[in-house]
Curated annotation (Swiss-Prot):
Transcription factor involved in RNA polymerase II transcription regulation. May function in both SPT15/TBP post-recruitment and recruitment steps of transcription. It comes from Debaryomyces hansenii (strain ATCC 36239 / CBS 767 / BCRC 21394 / JCM 1990 / NBRC 0083 / IGC 2968) (Yeast). This is Transcription factor IWS1. One of its GO terms (molecular function) is chromatin binding. Keywords: Nucleus, Transcription, Transcription regulation. The lineage of its organism: Eukaryota, Fungi, Dikarya, Ascomycota, Saccharomycotina. GO terms for cellular component: RNA polymerase II, core complex.
Length: 404
């Protein structure tokens, strides 16, 4: 037998002995020396390379020495990889250092204990939870950043428009004081109306105090002339859409300008109705008044015809001459007659009627009323009788009432 065949037989015999040794019992047997727990540092590189998943779970390598033949006088070390899972305490400490709390141990999810869970199942579960938490945190951060960017863009847009409006108002004031035509606000009116009509910008408009620029646009010019009617109409109608609160009124001061429009005789009638409604809506919360008609309190006062006539005549004599509207002024300038315009009158005091006085008046006038009623009734009945008698009589087409 050659040397090569002898080495092969020796290797097979030793391999069979090692396999029988590991299959007989789990406890190491002492054979020519004590079993020891160690890592063979002189092992070849090919035997050291292990997969990443296996390296995470290998914590010890159990080695057993098997004596060889006396002729060769060498020993073969057979190694058994003992794979152990991490202890729960070590895993928990490592997880706490990373700042990660799995859903299973979160009190919000019941606080379940996974200490006896299979290592592979635990590893898979933790990986899934990390991925879910990472995805949720990234999306939430991205959403918040987008919202902040959008709000910042809206604020910048409102601030830029506010600066433009203030600049245009100042230029119109300068031109009006110099006797020139003020047209800067009219050039910018379409852009301002476009911004004020957008519902998604309402909060940004109020927070950035764009109402201050609106107040400057509605204020009279230095020569006491009103702004262009188109500016008045568009801006005042846009105020009805905005959710204006008391704080916004105080910061902007726009309420004073609308009171001026309410009391001015040069304000157009339909526009004055809108102004009255706005002022009523704004002052009602300040005065703690309800907008329900049922909660409305009406003031009553006794009505005396003679005294009221005397007061009315004296008031007419002492009343100053009313200011003319723009339409009346233009008609007078062209020497034309102006169509009378309806005046908005609001009555705040209701007359108090005495029921007993009404009864006495009714009793005193019953006689005259009865005679008058009889005459009218007789006249109506006679008119009806004449109509009936005037109807033509004779045979009909069908031959009814025909005498043969």
């Amino acid at each position: 037998m050659s040397d090569k065949e002898g080495e092969t037989a020796l290797y097979n015999d030793r391999e069979e002995e090692a396999r029988q040794f590991f299959s007989d019992s789990a406890e190491p047997q002492s054979q020519g020396g004590s079993n020891e727990l160690a890592v063979n540092e002189n092992e070849d590189n090919n035997n050291d390379e292990v997969e990443d998943d296996a390296d995470e779970n290998i914590y010890s390598i159990q080695a057993h020495k098997i004596t060889g033949d006396e002729e060769n006088n060498r020993e073969v070390t057979m190694k058994k990889n003992v794979r152990k899972a991490k202890k729960y305490d070590e895993f928990k400490n490592e997880r706490d250092e990373q700042g990660f709390v799995p859903m299973g141990e979160n009190p919000e999810y019941g606080g379940m204990d996974y200490s006896n869970e299979d290592p592979q199942a635990r590893k898979r579960r933790l990986l899934e939870e990390k991925m879910e938490s990472a995805i949720k945190s990234k999306t939430s951060r991205r959403r918040r950043a987008d919202e902040d960017d959008l709000e910042r863009m809206q604020d910048d847009r409102i601030d830029f428009l506010k600066d433009q409006m203030i600049k245009a108002a100042n230029l119109d004031v300068e031109k009006n004081s110099q006797g020139q035509i003020a047209t800067e606000k009219l050039k910018l009116l379409n852009e301002v109306v476009d911004i004020l009509s957008k519902a998604d910008l309402a909060i940004s408009i109020l927070d950035n105090n764009l109402l201050e620029a609106v107040r400057l646009w509605l204020e009279p010019l230095p020569d006491a002339s009103m702004p262009a009617y188109q500016i008045q109409k568009e801006l005042i109608h846009s105020l009805t859409v905005l959710p204006i609160k008391t704080d916004h009124l105080i910061a902007s001061g726009i309420g004073k300008v609308l009171v001026y429009y309410q009391r001015s005789k040069r304000t157009e009638a339909n526009l004055k109705k809108v102004v009255d409604r706005l002022i009523g809506d704004w002052t009602r919360p300040i005065l703690n008044k309800s907008d329900s008609y049922k909660d409305r309190t009406i003031q009553f006062n006794e009505y005396n015809k003679n005294r009221f006539t005397n007061q009315l005549s004296s008031a007419r004599r002492s009343k100053p001459k009313e200011a003319k509207s723009l339409y009346e002024e233009s008609a007078e300038r062209r020497k034309r007659a102006a169509i009378p315009a309806a005046r908005t009158t609001a009555y705040k005091i209701a007359p108090k009627v005495d029921p007993s006085l009404l009864r006495r008046q009714q009793l005193n006038s019953n006689g005259n009323n009865d005679e008058r009623f009889k005459r009218i009734n007789q006249k109506l009945t006679s008119m009806n009788f004449k109509k009936k008698s005037s109807k033509k009589s004779g045979p009909s087409i069908e031959g009814r009432n025909l005498t043969i």
